[in-house]
A protein has these predicted regions:
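Two-component/phosphorelay signaling modules centered on CheY-like receiver
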Residues: 12-30, 96
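Acidic catalytic/metal-coordinating carboxylates
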Residues: 34-37, 60-63
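Conserved phosphotransfer cores of two-component systems
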Residues: 43-45, 67-75, 96
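Active-site residues of response regulator receiver
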Residues: 53
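Receiver (REC) domain active-site loop signature in two-component systems and cognate sites
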Residues: 56
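Alpha4 helix (beta4-alpha4-beta5 surface) of REC/receiver domains from two-component response regulators
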Residues: 63, 84-102, 113
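Hydrophobic/aromatic residues positioned on beta-strands within the core alpha/beta folds
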Residues: 80-81
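C-terminal output helix
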Residues: 106-115, 119
Length: 120
């Protein structure tokens, strides 16, 4: 498996925080700031994992997750959003193909614990 990650969030410091964590784990990290960028970047770099915010401009993260899952049934997507506290968003995330969910804000241990679920 390649160790390439795509971090998708419209907030730059969140992308940086996740990027730092994943680079420590040996991942090459690419970034996107909205769902449309995420889809284009996914097609270009074929990441092994994707972290995805929900509420973003241009395209909602759940829609982008669904498009990515349609492109690649084996996609490993983790939703990182304050929205996952709401059961309906978690349900929609699962329907869109997400395999792990993390509520913001989070620390590195919480992130890695949830991230590991992508590989179960």
């Amino acid at each position: 498996m390649n160790k390439i990650a795509l971090v998708v969030d419209d907030t730059s410091y969140i992308r940086e925080d996740i990027k730092d964590i994943l680079e420590e784990q040996g991942y090459k990290v690419y970034e996107a700031s909205d769902g449309l960028e995420a889809i284009e970047m996914y097609k270009k770099v074929s990441p092994s994992v994707v972290t995805m915010d929900i509420n973003m401009p241009r395209m909602h993260g759940l829609k982008a997750a669904q498009v990515i899952t349609d492109l690649d049934k084996e996609a490993r997507i983790m939703i990182c959003s304050t929205m996952v506290m709401f059961p309906n968003y978690m349900k929609m995330g699962k329907e869109a193909g997400a395999k792990a969910f993390l509520s913001k804000p989070f620390d590195e241990d919480e992130f890695m614990n949830e991230f590991s679920k992508l590989f179960l």
